[in-house]
Amino acid sequence: MYKKAQNPVVVTIVMIVLAVALIGGFFLARHIGEKNRETRKSKTEVEKLMELDLDENYPGTAREVLKINNRLMKCYYNEELTDEQIKALAMQNQKLFDEELLKRNPYDVYVGRLKKEIESYKKSKVTIINIGLQELADAETEEKGGYKFCNLLVSYFLKEGNGHKKTNHKYYLREDENGKWKILFWEVTTKTF
């Protein structure tokens, strides 16, 4: 059989084309991977809170419950939210509420009040610039009527127009039958921690 000799120029060109394609493919795959990582990292706080699975990953302590509640507060009053985002965040917020608080604040009523409060904050140009949360070791705790209670202080540092002010709230939480701490109610207080 007769075998035709390979042209060295053609072989060299084919090898160069394959090398360029291989190197180009590597860099393209790397670039796409970096873009995907950036997309995952660049979620807003609103998106992160909306995606929280509180049914499966409920916070383990009363303080952790209030940390999530405070993150929600900052979003309500500091971010420009759509109606859908407000509703989704309110639904997440209500997962932190005790049954008694839910009875007094059905979802639709809660969302309506929340929208009015957000609008009031926006008109007054009030934003939350920082939040202080009492340490769990310093919290008031008690057992009463077969329930465990935990009271924690939260300080909200607000920017109002050109000035600043601080408001303190006392949150009352109760542990439910599943061992989950839920917000029973809160009130404005002069106490600080």
Regions found by a protein language model. Give the residues of each.
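Hydrophobic core residues within well-ordered beta-strands of beta-rich domains
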Residues: 65, 150, 167-169
